[in-house]
Amino acid sequence: MRKAAVKRKTAETDIALELCLDGTGTADIDTGVGFLDHMLTLTAKHGRLDLSVRCAGDTRVDDHHSTEDIGIALGSAFREALGDKRGIRRYGSMILPMDEALVLCAVDLSGRSLLRYSLELRARKVGTFDTELAEEFFLAFTRAAGVTLHLRQLDGRNTHHILEAAFKGFGRALREAVAADPDAAGEIPSTKGTLE
């Protein structure tokens, strides 16, 4: 089983996170940010990731620090759980519909951190969640995980639906990328011989 546990404590947040890449989609999430809990639960379910997150953050200020630091913790756990990436597919993609919303998500577990984020979110908030924080979450994840991630909105008007499609697509793309490649068992999927 490919798994990792990360603890991250700063003056702003205290996070305990456990991740299993070979899971069933079980999520036990309490971040103090309700909408983020919902999105991470969707990512775990659609990625078949077992994910546990506990976060005590300075949400009396706003949700920024918790959202960003959870992205860092999840990215760190993801990188650790993957190990040397031997035998994985490396690439994953999904075009995911959520009612009128349609979002493309593509990942490369290259070891190089890059985020291309093209979501046009009309609402500044969903519930109490500042929608601009979704980009901060994905940016923090890509930096910590060493992952290239493209998120592109192809259609949609409802901000909740667009974000839901993005997080579900993210889970599905990760699931595909971390899956074993039966044609390359034991091989590192790079002509360089490493993915760092």
Regions found by a protein language model. Name each.
Residues M1-E196:
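Structural preference for solvent-exposed beta-strand-turn elements
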